[in-house]
């Protein structure tokens, strides 16, 4: 019997979906991402969404100002799609290397999405332009109709929005972000080379029982919400299969403790401190460590048409203790897996 590996050496990974926020929160959370990842797709859903080239340039600079000396990190900026967005502004940002992709939030689907898109028809000229440019569309894949159960929002989105959109724009590159269901896993698996998906550590590690049985755990509450264990298992099987159009996207989404532990708490898991080790745990549990590097470091660049990072990261079989909380200026952050240990840690 072969002894389990003690070291995992992979090309420096990228995070293809992260929320870095702004202000003091940004200064606190950026180093957890920039220390490990070479690049990150930065979500544009600030309180004032990133809808112009100038706003993206300014936000990118605030991020870079928060990167500690010695970290080699490039934020990849995204444009927040709205019903009134100017396609020329989007194209300018893409050609100038400011916008890497554009983000579709259905209106009111998640944090700071009230400015989001009300219908695909409203932004069809913009999407047609993106198809011509080869610019990826990043999709929060949930419908938000009041009559649709929250656990069914993703599956309904596939039937009513995603598939009609991809039928109309057959060469549009689409990332189905943070997929959570067996429906989405199968849909992406059956798709063509223009369709990919990101998957978070929490949706691979947990299901809704973990969040709701024996007491409600607000720090596992995120959107899309954790689903049944059959959906969790489908996601685990997808990544364990070595499927090349699924890649790392943490959806790390920090909120202060008082905004999570309250009568109406915010959605989001701040998983940046533990995400890479958490993914390694899942791949090891699935006997799929052979596919770990591709998921973290190779599949994303291949889909985006970007080079693989030149540097390397080593994970060691050395238990990492996740802190109970992380200080903020006037509050604290409770990270994903707070107080627990993860058996793979990034070698410093």
Curated annotation (Swiss-Prot):
Keywords: Hydrolase, Metal-binding, Pyrimidine biosynthesis, Zinc. SUPFAM superfamilies: Metallo-dependent hydrolases (SSF51556). The modification N6-carboxylysine is found at residue 103. One of its GO terms (molecular function) is zinc ion binding. GO terms for biological process: 'de novo' pyrimidine nucleobase biosynthetic process; 'de novo' UMP biosynthetic process. Gene3D superfamilies: Metal-dependent hydrolases. It catalyses: (S)-dihydroorotate + H2O = N-carbamoyl-L-aspartate + H(+). GO terms for cellular component: cytosol. Substrate binds at residues 19-21, 45, 140, 223, 255, 267. The keyword Hydrolase applies. CDD domains: DHOase. Its EC number is 3.5.2.3. The active site is at 251. Homodimer. Catalyzes the reversible cyclization of carbamoyl aspartate to dihydroorotate. This is Dihydroorotase.
